[in-house]
């Protein structure tokens, strides 16, 4: 992940490291920052942002600032989709891959056990190139699911 993050920084992107799991993610973020600083202590690190996140509202605020979200967390994927954000999902569990597939975004889901920086870069570039269309599709899918949920609520309330 350090090589991918450095690639993003070197190509002019701002990288926000935001926790969606409040116990383990801060440890990962700290380790990632240390690794990046060790590899490249002066390389565009002013665009590497790691603001503390301790509430749902702060998570949503951080995700809202992103144009593309790269996450391995299920809730990071869900919240990003709800915000209409394109997601590069690093899948550690089938539920992440399944959600990406359900949203028509399975081509932007990578298995964490076979993860390589080059594959992340390639998928990120594809997502960046198509992010307008991808965002539109995600918003349409979210609207479709909201409508289905409203129908389910109406049916349950009539029981």
Residue ranges and their predicted role:
Residues 1-159:
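Active-site anion-handling motifs in enzyme catalytic cores
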